[in-house]
Amino acid sequence: MAETFKHTTVLLDEAVNGLSIRSNGIYIDGTFGRGGHSRLILSHLGPEGRLLAIDRDPQAVEVANTIDDARFSIIHGPFSELAEYVEARGLTGKIDGILLDLGVSSPQLDDPERGFSFMRDGPLDMRMDPTRGQSAADWLMKAEADDIAWVLKTFGEERFAKRIARAIVERNRIDPLTRTKALAELIAAASPIREKYKHPATRSFQAIRIYINSELEEIERALDGALTVLAPGGRLSVISFHSLEDRIVKRFIRQHSRGPQVPAGLPLTEAQLRSQGGPTLKSVGKMMPPDDEVADNPRARSSVLRFAERLPS
């Protein structure tokens, strides 16, 4: 098994409690990670309960395979395909709760060989599943400066995106970037102003990681899938770690809590209005980590937990 890196699960009890677990229910942990949420869910389930876990990181799947529990199964793949996994098992509309813990995990950040961190030197990879897709180094080598700048601005809200993108392209023409430390140093040198208490490469590394892993598109597909597979009364519990993620989750819950929006003045009969359907979700709440959790685990600082409940169709 790969080297073990510590992972402290954020909002562990709160996220699981928000699922209102029934002992014989069927649940999905869409982001197994190192199994913190999964193990707690299993502790609430009775003999007839079931937990389906998903993770696209092979190292996470290795850990999951050590769980010897007939109620538990693990799928190696992206959580965006959860509706397909559920349909293949004949469980569409029967899922009692889904938990998604978004973003990169501590073991992924802490392992320099994964290439996620600007604080530790390693290969410039950043793939959550190293067996699929192109690495960050490969993409940066092929991409145009305008495309890199767009990614840095869109997914990292990096104010010096164009300057950094030009520096990356110029460097790759001479000496290709293959290590995280080299990229972090280049970004720092290209950034004329530094934010207090924040490394100048923070936003760019986040942006490149999000792009390489299609993270925002994955979230959108996973949320759509969750709505399809949840049973009436089923719960959705989602932890996000930055504003781009949380914005998607917040918008999704709000949109489906309102139901179809019919333009004012559109000449529809009452029957036609009813045929448009009503809301399919109910917002159940939002939580932030308590101060003591942030003190123990600084990575929890920016986390937001949102809950929703599936309404009958």
From Swiss-Prot:
Q: Which terms are listed as keywords in the entry?
A: Cytoplasm, Methyltransferase, rRNA processing, S-adenosyl-L-methionine, Transferase
Main localization is: cytoplasm
Tell me the superkingdom of the source.
Bacteria
The catalysed reaction is: cytidine(1402) in 16S rRNA + S-adenosyl-L-methionine = N(4)-methylcytidine(1402) in 16S rRNA + S-adenosyl-L-homocysteine + H(+)
Name the InterPro entries for this protein: RsmH, SAM-dep_MeTrfase_MraW_recog, SAM-dependent_MTases_sf
* A single BP term in Gene Ontology: rRNA base methylation
Any idea where this protein resides?
A: Cytoplasm
Supply the EC number(s).
2.1.1.199
State what protein this is by name. Ribosomal RNA small subunit methyltransferase H
Taxonomy of origin reads: Bacteria, Pseudomonadati, Pseudomonadota, Gammaproteobacteria, Enterobacterales
